[in-house]
Every structure is written in C-alpha cells, then in structure tokens.
C-alpha cells in the first residue's frame, strides 16, 4: 500500500513540475514579447523625439479595431523594405493587455522590426492631449517629422504618393541611390 501511495504522489509531483515548467516557459515567452512593445505613458513622446533628434521619421497611431490601419501598415512595410533607412514608430491606441495581439498583427503586416508602443494610461485622453491637442483619437493618425521635427499630421488612409513625396523631401533614399 505504501508503494502505491508513493507512486501516486510521485506521479502528481511529476505533473506539478511539468505544469510549473510550462507556466515558466509561457511567462518567459510573454515577457519577451511584451518587451518588444513598450508602454506609452505621459512623457513617452519626448523619449521618441529625443531618440531621433535631427532625424526624420514617421509616427503612426493605430488600433486593432481600425478599418484602414491594415492597409496603411502594409503600405508602410513595403516602403520600409524599399527604404531601409526609413524610421517608423508604431503606437497602438489599444491597451497593454492587448500586447500579444498587437505583436501578432504587426508581424502579419511586416512591421515587427519597427519600434512599437502601446497606450498605458488609465485616461488615454491625457495622452492624446499631450501628443496633439487637436487629435480626438481617430486612427490611423500619422505624423511626418522632418529633420527639425516640424511635423505634418494626417488622419485616415494616406496614399502611397504622399509617402513617397515625403521620403524624397526628407532625403530618405532607397538602396542604390
């Protein structure tokens, strides 16, 4: 009888270790994924701008629910492939709890190699106010920053010609030029 109880407890012990290992691997995977999308809080815009001092870049606000975002993000992915020096920053207006879906969606659009952030404030209105007092949360919302960080904003789907003209004006060339 003792050996049967010992065998049952050993079996339970093995199961618990297996579950613990699975939980640890899941946590490590989620932690690694979460590191690729940073929390966007008050002051984060200043970090984005400071990291790009004197350099042109495109800042894109998007959401998982956005009807036009897939089209714009796919177009930006194509432009990034043809202009590797193009600096794009994605900021999702969703919540931090959506991070796994944001990573997956960005990857599906070919945007997994760009800097990504997600709104991480209880009151997103405060973030929008800090970003642009005239912005009320509609997406996609795209800001085109030149070398002096003068910006031009566009709401909605932007045509490829506008992007290409901006790239030419801001000397973001493609390989071989």
Regions found by a protein language model. Name each.
Residues 30-49, 113:
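N-terminal "domain-start" segment that seeds a small globular fold
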Residues 66-69, 142:
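The canonical Cys-X-X-Cys-His
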């Amino acid at each position: 009888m003792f050996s049967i109880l010992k065998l049952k407890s050993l079996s339970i012990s093995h199961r618990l270790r297996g579950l613990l290992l699975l939980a640890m691997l899941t946590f490590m995977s989620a932690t690694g994924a979460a590191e690729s999308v940073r929390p966007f809080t008050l002051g984060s815009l200043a970090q984005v701008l400071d990291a790009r001092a004197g350099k042109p870049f495109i800042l894109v606000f998007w959401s998982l629910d956005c009807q036009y975002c897939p089209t714009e993000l796919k177009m930006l992915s194509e432009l990034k492939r043809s202009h590797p020096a193009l600096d794009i920053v994605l900021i999702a207006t969703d919540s931090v709890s959506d991070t796994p879906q944001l990573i997956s969606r960005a990857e599906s659009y070919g945007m997994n190699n760009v800097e990504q952030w997600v709104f991480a404030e209880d009151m997103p209105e405060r973030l929008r106010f800090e970003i642009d007092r005239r912005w009320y949360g509609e997406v996609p919302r795209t800001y085109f920053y030149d070398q002096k960080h003068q910006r031009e904003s566009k709401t909605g789907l932007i045509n490829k010609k506008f992007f290409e003209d901006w790239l030419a004006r801001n000397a973001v060339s493609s390989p071989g030029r």
